[in-house]
């Protein structure tokens, strides 16, 4: 939705619309609880203009998508931090932000982890538990410097810091349910 190319935006709207239709067909309520989570897309050399295009193109989406859409912070410094999304998207169109702990390490927008988490939390409706994503670096887990630092690890070994907030945490790890099982064995 940030693209300056109309055909790219049209394709994105078509794809998101299909997601919204499927969610409707299986009876999921139209709230961010049943989220369609996306990264907002490229910055195209001008983040402010790209976020403005995102907000304008958001209005072209059907209600089945608009009511469920959430946005997530990126893992590259040149892309979108929680702070960018909060002021450039949420403040204009009210889309909740899914905080990704691992991505924040690479694109912090000048905020601490706690500040970014709590900013993202504040974007959610009060009757829905905010969603977050948590992963750890595969490079650090494997102690292999040839692995991209942003790559997800097999397991999540560190205790997830919620800073006293009530949040839903989606674990992103290569070993999926086994990773969650191991985390619960380690941290309860």
Model-found features: residue ranges?
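Anionic group-transfer/hydrolysis microenvironments
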Residues: 74, 102, 174
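Active-site acidic/histidine proton-transfer and metal-coordination neighborhood
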Residues: 1-96
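Histidine-acidic metal/acid-base catalytic patches
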Residues: 95, 106-188
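Sequence-level detector for tyrosine residue identity
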Residues: 33, 44, 80, 86-90, ...
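Short acidic, Gly/Ser-rich segments with clustered Asp/Glu that frequently serve as metal-coordination loops
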Residues: 77, 102-108
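Conserved, mostly hydrophobic/aromatic
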Residues: 69, 100, 169
């Amino acid at each position: 939705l940030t693209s300056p190319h109309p055909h790219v935006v049209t394709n994105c709207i078509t794809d998101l619309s299909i997601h919204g239709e499927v969610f409707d067909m299986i009876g999921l309520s139209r709230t961010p609880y049943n989220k369609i989570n996306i990264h907002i897309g490229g910055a195209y050399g001008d983040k402010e203009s790209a976020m403005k295009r995102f907000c304008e193109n958001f209005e072209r989406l059907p209600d089945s998508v608009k009511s469920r859409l959430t946005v997530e912070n990126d893992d590259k410094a040149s892309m979108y931090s929680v702070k960018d999304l909060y002021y450039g998207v949420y403040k204009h169109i009210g889309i909740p932000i899914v905080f990704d702990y691992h991505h924040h390490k690479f694109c912090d927008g000048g905020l601490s982890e706690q500040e970014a988490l709590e900013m993202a939390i504040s974007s959610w409706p009060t009757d829905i538990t905010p969603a977050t994503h948590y992963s750890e670096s595969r490079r650090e887990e494997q102690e292999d410097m040839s692995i991209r630092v942003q790559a997800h690890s097999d397991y999540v070994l560190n205790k997830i810091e919620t800073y006293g907030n009530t949040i839903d945490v989606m674990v992103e790890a290569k070993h999926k349910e086994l990773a969650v099982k191991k985390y619960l064995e380690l941290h309860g």
